[in-house]
Amino acid sequence: MRRRDFVRQSCASLLALHAVQRWPLGWGRVRGQAPWLLIPMDDAQTDHLKAYGVAFRAVKRGTRAEWFLNYRNGAFLLPSESVTAKDAALAGVLTEALEEDQLAQIRGQIQGGNMDAVPLEKPPKVAVYAPPNAPPWDDAVTMALNYAGIDFDKIWDGEVLGQKLRTYDWLHLHHEDFTGQYSKFFLNYAGAPWLVDMVNRNRAMAQSQGFPSVPAEKRAVAVAIANFVERGGFLFAMCTATETLDLALAADGVDIAAAYSDGTPMDPNASAKMKWDRALAFHNAQLELSPTIPVYSDIDGHQVNSPERRQPLGSFTLFNFSAKIDPVATMLVQNHRQVIPDFYGLTTSFTRKTLKPSVTVLAEEPGAPWVKYIHGEHGQGTWTFFGGHDPEDPQHQIGDVPTDLSLHPHSPGYRLILNNVLFPAAKKKELKT
């Protein structure tokens, strides 16, 4: 090779090498590309649910990221790193390139409107409370996390009582009965293999932990979860876990379980003896006394398993909050839809009359005596309750086929779930919510 050709080729190689700017952790951006990527979350987005996974993984890599509250329905801003662009492309998530002047215009728009730019600093370590043999489709949050590609661990009673909760930031509860009554299915589904398995598994766990009954063991688990929140943990619960967690917490020294659970009948005066100061969200509820009706109390507004009291499904509406004053509430309601079709669960909704005054209502069915989505603080941490079981399976009958989220990539109900996963990553500042 001639010296001239060698020099020309060497210079070309050096130029190609220096065309890649190195960002933190070694992720490269090719010179000439726009410096920023916007992940829009309005109707332009091709996969709303997987967009959360792209943002979560970017933050996990140490990438600087921001959540643009109320701008394009909760868009994400990320540096234009090659690994992020590739991740988004493989996930089928739409990104838009931004130049510095375009970003400056967006920031001006955010500053002047009911919007805010919230830095995302550290993704939470996520745990999902579920029995060891729970199928992945039995829990909407598990499905959402798997579909979005967000890492999580499954834990159950042994881990909770063994103090492992201290190693996590965010905990999800779903179709769990913390009153220890097997979802009150014991009499109506006696002999069903899935119920027999549930009963045997819970009785074995209670015995292994040294408790005299499943209700006693489940209440201890509920107290441990409340302590997790009090120490600064983030709790997100759906379906029966919302109502039964508070019932278990308030039932200090009160027998609220049917005889098939602990060998003694429920105290007929239990409602008057509940210690509601121990509960997170609810107070002054009236408990269901019948062991044959799979209903716990009048906390649930829809009473889906009581033929005489069952209410039809409607739609619920998300509230608007001030992004700069109430950033937490604003994060939790980011969505490309404000009105969302309702969906049943064993606990579908929360009656207004049983909400503590400190509760923030995030979504309601206008004119109805119940709300759908609520939030509050407990000690140093926060809790969020979302009624219903699966946003894309409104009736949710036992034995229904699993929901395929690839058919629902724009699900507004599942977006609310993923808002809860991501908001603990937001940079903390003085909040009024």
Where are these regions (language model features)?
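Alpha-helical scaffolding within the catalytic cores
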Residues: 111-114, 158-160, 368-372
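Structural recognition of the beta-strand scaffold that forms the well-ordered cores
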Residues: 127-128, 172-173, 235-237, 383-387
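Serine-dependent carboxylesterase/thioesterase catalytic core
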Residues: 227-230, 242, 246-291, 295
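N-terminal export signals
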Residues: 5-27
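Hydrophobic targeting/anchoring helices
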Residues: 31-139, 388
